[in-house]
Amino acid sequence: MEKWTAWEPQGADALRRFQGLLLDRRGRLHCQVLRLREVARRLERLRRRSLAANVAGSSLSAAGALAAIVGLSLSPVTLGASLVASAVGLGVATAGGAVTITSDLSLIFCNSREVRRVQEIAATCQDQMRELLSCLEFFCQWQGRGDRQLLQSGRDASMALYNSVYFIVFFGSRGFLIPRRAEGATKVSQAVLKAKIQKLSESLESCTGALDELSEQLESRVQLCTKAGRGHNLRNSPDLDAALFF
């Protein structure tokens, strides 16, 4: 009994350290999710402005084309006034086209900028999750013959992280982010990019959810270890503390 009591604080302390590490890394991943959501919001705002600009440009082009057609049709009768109407109509139509072209250029520049930003976020998340995977792998080995429920939570968190890492590797490839030629720099390519960003956010959120579940399991075990004096049921190793600070 004295031996178990001596081991209890060490086991509880190791679990607390590990839980603190998980919460810290979980917070960092959540920050990246927030950054991705902000990128998606910016794309949505630009999409709406672009849609309004395209509608305005189309209206101007239609009005200008109508004026030009009417002016040309009247030119044999009233040469001077009709040609002026045609010139004004063509000018209005050109202005409408300029609005649309400017909107398309904004899509090109914005998409390029946001793609670089998302790739940076994905690379940061990948590094963070690799660190977490190393720690979780050691935790599962350390907990191997201990609490099976806690071990399963650790494995679930590892699986979620593995899936997200694989997704990020695929996500970071050029072909996945860069619009295809068939899409071009259009609202379609922007919508596709936004959908991909949302998919990446969902993948990262699945990781934070698994880490939250493991953290709750750790908290309950720490309380059990402290209040019920059952720290001897948790395997303890001096290597765990060293592994928590990789």
Curated annotation (Swiss-Prot):
One Gene Ontology CC term in the entry: Weibel-Palade body
Tissue-specificity statement: Present at low levels in brain vascular cells (at protein level).
Any one Gene Ontology molecular-function term assigned to this protein's record: lipid binding
Domain of life: Eukaryota
Keyword Membrane: yes
Coiled-coil stretches: 193-220
Induction info: In the brain, by electrical or chemical seizures (at protein level).
UniProt entry keywords in alphabetical sequence: Cell junction, Cell membrane, Coiled coil, Cytoplasmic vesicle, Membrane, Transmembrane, Transmembrane helix
Gene Ontology process terms (BP): angiogenesis; autophagosome-dependent secretion; endothelial cell activation; lipid transport; lipoprotein metabolic process; regulation of endothelial cell differentiation; regulation of membrane permeability; response to hypoxia
First-listed, main subcellular location of the protein, grouped into a coarse class: membrane
Function recorded in the entry: Is a modulator of endothelial barrier permeability, required for proper organization of endothelial cell-cell junctions and cytoskeleton. It also plays a role in the modulation of secretory autophagy. May affect blood-brain barrier permeability.
Protein family (similarity comment): Belongs to the apolipoprotein L family.
Protein name, as recorded: Apolipoprotein L domain-containing protein 1
Organism expressing this protein natively: Rattus norvegicus
Source lineage: Eukaryota, Metazoa, Chordata, Craniata, Vertebrata
